[in-house]
Amino acid sequence: MEKDLSSLYSEKKDKENDETLFNIKLSKSVVETTPLNGHSLFDDDKSLSDWTDNVFTQSVFYHGSDDLIWGKFFVCVYKSPNSNKLNAIIFDKLGTSCFESVDISSNSQYYPAIENLSPSDQESNVKKCIAVILLQRYPLLSPSDLSQILSNKSENCDYDPPYAGDLASSCQLITAVPPEDLGKRFFTSGLLQNRFVSSTLLDVIYENNESTIELNNRLVFHLGEQLEQLFNPVTEYSPEQTEYGYKAPEDELPTESDDDLVKAICNELLQLQTNFTFNLVEFLQKFLIALRVRVLNEEINGLSTTKLNRLFPPTIDEVTRINCIFLDSLKTAIPYGSLEVLKACSITIPYFYKAYTRHEAATKNFSKDIKLFIRHFSNVIPEREVYTEMKIESIIKGPQEKLLKLKLIIERLWKSKKWRPKNQEMAKKCYNNIIDVIDSFGKLDSPLHSYSTRVFTPSGKILTELAKCWPVELQYKWLKRRVVGVYDVVDLNDENKRNLLVIFSDYVVFINILEAESYYTSDGSNRPLISDILMNSLINEVPLPSKIPKLKVERHCYIDEVLVSILDKSTLRFDRLKGKDSFSMVCKLSSAFISSSSVADLITKARILEKDTAFHLFKASRSHFTLYSTAHELCAYDSEKIKSKFALFLNIPPSKEILEVNNLHLAFFARFCSNDGRDNIVILDVLTKHDDKHIEVTSDNIVFTIINQLAIEIPICFSSLNSSMAKDLLCVNENLIKNLEHQLEEVKHPSTDEHRAVNSKLSGASDFDATHEKKRSYGTITTFRSYTSDLKDSPSGDNSNVTKETKEILPVKPTKKSSKKPREIQKKTKTNASKAEHIEKKKPNKGKGFFGVLKNVFGSKSKSKPSPVQRVPKKISQRHPKSPVKKPMTSEKKSSPKRAVVSSPKIKKKSTSFSTKESQTAKSSLRAVEFKSDDLIGKPPDVGNGAHPQENTRISSVVRDTKYVSYNPSQPVTENTSNEKNVEPKADQSTKQDNISNFADVEVSASSYPEKLDAETDDQIIGKATNSSSVHGNKELPDLAEVTTANRVSTTSAGDQRIDTQSEFLRAADVENLSDDDEHRQNESRVFNDDLFGDFIPKHYRNKQENINSSSNLFPEGKVPQEKGVSNENTNISLKTNEDASTLTQKLSPQASKVLTENSNELKDTNNEGKDAKDIKLGDDYSDKETAKEITKPKNFVEGITERKEIFPTIPRLAPPASKINFQRSPSYIELFQGMRVVLDKHDAHYNWKRLASQVSLSEGLKVNTEEDAAIINKSQDDAKAERMTQISEVIEYEMQQPIPTYLPKAHLDDSGIEKSDDKFFEIEEELKEELKGSKTGNEDVGNNNPSNSIPKIEKPPAFKVIRTSPVRIIGRTFEDTRKYENGSPSDISFTYDTHNNDEPDKRLMELKFPSQDEIPDDRFYTPAEEPTAEFPVEELPNTPRSINVTTSNNKSTDDKLSSGNIDQKPTELLDDLEFSSFNIAFGNTSMSTDNMKISSDLSSNKTVLGNAQKVQESPSGPLIYVLPQSSTKHEKEGFLRKKQKDEPIWVSPSKIDFADLSRRTKALTPERNTVPLKNNDSRKYKYTGEGSIGNMTNMLLTKDASYAYLKDFVALSDDEDEDGKQNCAVGGPEKLKFY
């Protein structure tokens, strides 16, 4: 038996060894070359040390550029140690090509290329080798390959030996970097290593026909294991290995002598950890493990392992393990004193982070799930007496809560202990590390001020700032996005540099950790990985801790555009396959416990998650390769957006059209050999664009056959010119070579510490500091960018020299007069200098006027002292409105070549005319753009930009140090405006800077260039900056470096600057240059640029003057009334509402755009924001003069307001329906907030939600900026019109702000004091109102033609009043108005509701609570402009005011509105909710009287709908209370003042109930007061009055049975009693408080 077992294992081992040989390797070159000897240098998977020892130490590197075929390329030439012959490796857009044993003798068939070398290179064996291989590789290309590779397909390919010889002569030796270092860069870029694919996706397509269902199922059965879930929770929750552990001191002596208090604290810490750990262990042993065993044995019906693991995830095991380790560490450390206790905590507590993070994420819904579990399985769980629901929940939720206790104890230990001086530093370090780790679980020191750089999680929560330059593509779709993985990665060229790899379900993001060395210290302190912290922030929706380093997004790509290949066990290469935007990134995982294959597997899983159609999932593996198969129905597959390049079609006829339609590289067509499927033979047709096969296999081997075929086709698809993605592959390699070239350019000018400091100072606002503080950003909600883009940290005083039109500083370059070069030489040996000339020659028409303009500007001084222009207006984005004032810059391709500075050719000869200091300055300034190690595997500066920058444009941070870039030593400020028109556009300059190829001083004979250039280009100047003799123009070079550095702070090149930041810079410039308002507004974006909820709650001020001043600064004179629709005297004031919904984003009213900040420091920025929003509508109707007038005369403006301060308009307006809102500029707003708008409560914390000023109709009928409207006044308006507007607005304000009118009995109108609310908003409003009333004139009631409508001022005593209630049902009957019996209404009635909200009640609450069981149309309730419905009598329409809950805007004249003083207020605010009736009661100077409360009660409990008292409605769900019929009611009085006794609830035998009558009863609106009238035959209506007596009320109460008195308020009134009860307001009697 033992022999059998051992043989079995040995066979299995041999089989595994065979399987390890199976892998899928990608090609290093898109054109495979077969070596002459059959063995390639790449056959062996060499390590970096092998390459360095055998190749790089004996090699030289050359750099060249070919415009015809190869593009930019590098050549490595070395001598083979075996054959003593020259070998060569070429790196270019084809990949890596190796040429061994190159024959450079005269017998070589490629010797003609050597003959065409320049005379100086004829003796160089290296140049001979390069010439031979350049000619040798050309015949290896087929015509089809050549057509794809040619840079310019329109030109004829004249590639011959002379061309190859000239191209070899033009190659330059690279001496800036040692060959070993340069070889390492190629190695770490993945150009020399073998790349493997570990997993891929196969789409399986089937037709849903009954005839093929069974056959399809049989075929799918052999595709591998079917998975129920993509991520296996057991493997995902695998424990984290502890790399560090606490060890006791070796000398076994205490390091600290502790007193009794400190010892007690340490023992308390040990006791807490002991108890908690024992509880966890006991829970696992006695409950969870026992339950798992029973479930595995299938002893519990209905409970599977999957369900159990979902409720009790394996993370609890991991948490228990970490707590056990911590307990062991504490037990070991306590005998050695308090310092060792801190050390043990500092080492062990960081392991809590990952375990607790995953545990919290896995138990989010535990409270709900455990209730369901206990309900169904309480009788089968072990020890159910001990482990109750509360006990289990406390154990599962305990770990997070215990952390706070640990923190408190450790803080007490730190404060109570007096540390020895030698231990003070170590103790502080350990203590800080412990606190930082615990705080990393989620601590928000300050409220979130703004939302511009936040990320919305799936549940709608807002995270703190994640990273600078957050991609625009990731600002929305968070409801669907999932976080798949976050990993720390290391830069291969700099081990101290850390990056982050974030894998979402739809995007892969590469993030730089700025100043990572400050976090990952080498002192042995154990800290959580930043990847774990970010994962916790994303998964558990907690803010990032304040002490992690700043993050900056470097790259990102869509999940379906990325190709992942494995370089070794811990290194991966990510290639984005997207044309010109392609790039390549190499990442090495920092953790040794995570394999590269597992990360590559997650990329495949993320692609599966991104699929948007239904599928079945299968998994098959062979060796280290995993195949995921997703089975789609044919119709669903047609609409699928995530499609693999490989597909399997079941029982579908083969067709190559399917390849074209679905963009497939490979298609399998499988079917059984016989129709009945009895035999297991499967016919497999394999189709590609270039070949097809016909294979017959058994059904068991179908998946292995597919994998074998994929092993052949995957390298062709992803690394060959035969692929449909050949252009993308070429672009990846081309951009990779450009990136290496850019790195070498930076290395050639190494940055000294001094220039590093300068560069750091320049980018100080751009780069994050180590304190991750929360700052306010003034950007838009649709932009995820850093707060530094708003120039919040820029010195305010440095903008004094900023020109008005400046948006971006561009480098200024001297222009040289170029001479013509022969065409054939340009073709064959075009260098970067000739490229620059070629760019100049494209625009000969604009070049002549150039010197004339410059001569006028500079005169003769320009020859010797060229004055650089400081700034150039940036090209206006295509999506911005065209400026009528300034002419926009043309596109980059056609930009003008004019420059502001010209260097005469004579300057070229003055190589020694500078002082030593100036020469050093020129040199150092060229090195201002330092080489950063984080760019070694990064992107080239101009990748994907080219001539179409808008395709790649996203909002990013641009930081300018205005103090630095405004330095202008040689040009006065007065020349700024004259130079602005003569500045070279950004495109030409960035193009030239990026084409630098002079990496070293290379010997090039003059014979290779027939004509000597008369002038050198800037690139040549920069390329030879290290040679002082070749540096020219001491005045221009420092500025050139300055502006170049400023432009490259946040990106690697000036070409990476994004045009979308111009509005941010413009807004910052407005703070200092307010007089430039109109010029700035011409270029301002039309996107909403304000805080999303800026005006949600009106801001309050310390005094009225501050309110007026801050408001007056927002809107210049003469602008506000033009926005208002003011017509004749009888026209209601309203906003213009006939605009389309989309116009709201472009025509914002001043009311909707102003934002009043709470402090004066923020007022300036907010002021400019208000202007920006306003300017969008005002356009250029207002000049700078008007703006300046407003700014220079704020005092007069304030005085104007003071004179008419009674104008406090509350402007009614018609809000468009929410369904018509379409914010075309902000798709993320629609996705994130359109469904959320009804749940944002204005009584939330003020820092959470702010009213969006520009979106008037976020909530139907809600007024905007009621309190601030006093500041929106047109000073230039004539006095008569202003006075008229004052009178109208006062009346309208009263009507809008009136609550449901209620009146106290006259007996209560005494002189008792008025007790005001303590609410600050209410006090301010009350104060303002009193002053407004004091300034009223005798014309207060102008327009009110009804003398009975006069409103006497009646002082009212304090009383309770209902200021807010839940909604009630809209009824169909009306009642007489009690106010017809009153002489007037109180004058101060407008402040009787909602002390928190000074404009209107919150209608969003009504949207949520409105019980729409009667199917009442929304337009009846929310559309104020609609005509009254038939339920309301026509004769009462004039007396119907505009409801408080509905903002109306009708055509009634002001006189008509004021004449309706005696109005029947439909109490739509006193509304009942179905389940919970809510109300607010305030104690103010006016009160709701009993009779009006009775009206509200009658309306609430009215059973009639649309006037039909007998309408049958559904039965109420609450208990029934029976009331006596009206006929048995006694009446004490007759006639108008007749009163009746209230019915008493009685018990009725069920046998006496008329069930037919029950079925016809009306529905009760409130379930807690459902009543059933037994007989309701009396339909008489009783009029009511405000008169009554206390005696009548007292007699009525005394006649009742005391035993039923407590039920009185809970019994709803019947119809007749409702009517008669309205007289209940007895004069002089005590007011009875009623609740609804």
From Swiss-Prot:
Superkingdom to which the source organism belongs: Eukaryota
GO terms under cellular component: cellular bud neck; cellular bud neck contractile ring
Gene Ontology BP term (one): axial cellular bud site selection
UniProt feature coiled coil, ranges: none
InterPro entries per the UniProt record, alphabetical: Bud3_N, DBL_dom_sf, DH_dom
Regions of compositional bias (Basic and acidic residues) in chain numbering: 981-991, 1161-1179
Compositionally biased residues, Low complexity: 912-921
Residue spans of biased composition, Polar residues class: 965-980, 1044-1063, 1342-1351, 1440-1452
Modified residues (Phosphothreonine): 1045, 1157, 1429, 1440
UniProt key word Cell cycle: yes
GO molecular-function terms, A-Z: guanyl-nucleotide exchange factor activity
Region (Disordered): 789-998, 1025-1063, 1107-1130, 1152-1179, 1331-1354, 1435-1465
SMART domains registered for this protein in UniProt: RhoGEF
UniProt cross-link Glycyl lysine isopeptide (Lys-Gly) (interchain with G-Cter in ubiquitin), position: 792, 963
Alphabetical keyword list: Cell cycle, Isopeptide bond, Phosphoprotein, Ubl conjugation
Compositionally biased tracts (Basic residues): 872-885
Record-listed Phosphoserine modification sites: 766, 1063, 1075, 1134, 1149, 1160, 1228, 1254, 1257, 1390, 1412, 1443, 1501, 1549, 1589, 1614
Subunit structure and binding partners: Interacts with AXL2.
Protein purpose: Co-assembles with BUD4 at bud sites. BUD4 and BUD3 may cooperate to recognize a spatial landmark (the neck filaments) during mitosis and they subsequently become a landmark for establishing the axial budding pattern in G1.
Family that this chain belongs to: Belongs to the BUD3 family.
This protein's name: Bud site selection protein 3
Native source species: Saccharomyces cerevisiae (strain ATCC 204508 / S288c) (Baker's yeast)
Gene name in the database record: BUD3
